[in-house]
């Protein structure tokens, strides 16, 4: 797999889902081997926070990265967009504690990356493809995530909610046959009207709105239309891609999740890291030729 970065910088700004704070993000090209990393430009000494598994701090309803001098939250949509675009070396400057939610999906990040363009930093293979040789799994109650040996990369996700408009949904995605930009990136985050007040009282979703999240109740969707009939499960798969990209090298495997969470995604990534020899350098992207443009 080869190293890629963006051709030119781009900027986006918006409100953070949980903090409710408006932040600006500037994404810039990086040199080969620098990897994907955040820089808190609003803090003294502008601390660097690598987008690596070792820096994961907490995962309630989002994924947060933390270094000794600073942290950044809700990184999963931007990281998924970078991964889905094949970008593995990039500097991400942010002037606040949380990545903007934008419209609740990864679509605007994908569009910004496409507009910026991509360049290949090296013309030689920088790391071999990592493969899963035996099943690796984590479980909590009836929720689980596992990685199965496979000849091609695949992600399969299942969800089951007691809201009739969602119910039980499954979706399986093969990057070689469907592009991330078309099949996954447009899927928005979702929530439930009867949980909004309790989440806000817990200090969460302060920036959530009908403009950046799908909301449903037991009667139906509060803010239709959906972009896909199974948009909720596609969004869960988006989150999984973003979380697994913190491994720096996503192994060739069939990843299967059911009723999982950011916490379980990260636990699987840690289990993989402890079992499979993963590059100690930067994220190498999906296996070569796994993505279509």
UniProtKB/Swiss-Prot annotation:
Pathway: Glycolipid biosynthesis; lipid IV(A) biosynthesis; lipid IV(A) from (3R)-3-hydroxytetradecanoyl-[acyl-carrier-protein] and UDP-N-acetyl-alpha-D-glucosamine: step 2/6
Cofactor(s), by name: Zn(2+)
GO CC aspect terms: membrane
The enzyme's E.C. designation: 3.5.1.108
NCBIfam families: lpxC
Keywords: Hydrolase, Lipid A biosynthesis, Lipid biosynthesis, Lipid metabolism, Metal-binding, Zinc
Family classification: Belongs to the LpxC family.
Catalytic activity: a UDP-3-O-[(3R)-3-hydroxyacyl]-N-acetyl-alpha-D-glucosamine + H2O = a UDP-3-O-[(3R)-3-hydroxyacyl]-alpha-D-glucosamine + acetate
Xref: InterPro entries: Ribosomal_Su5_D2-typ_SF, UDP-acyl_GlcNac_deAcase, UDP-acyl_GlcNac_deAcase_C, UDP-acyl_N-AcGlcN_deAcase_N
Active site (catalytic residues): 262
Lineage, uppermost ranks: Bacteria, Bacillati, Cyanobacteriota, Cyanophyceae, Oscillatoriophycideae
Protein name: UDP-3-O-acyl-N-acetylglucosamine deacetylase
Protein origin, superkingdom: Bacteria
Example GO molecular function: metal ion binding
Keyword Hydrolase belongs to the record: yes
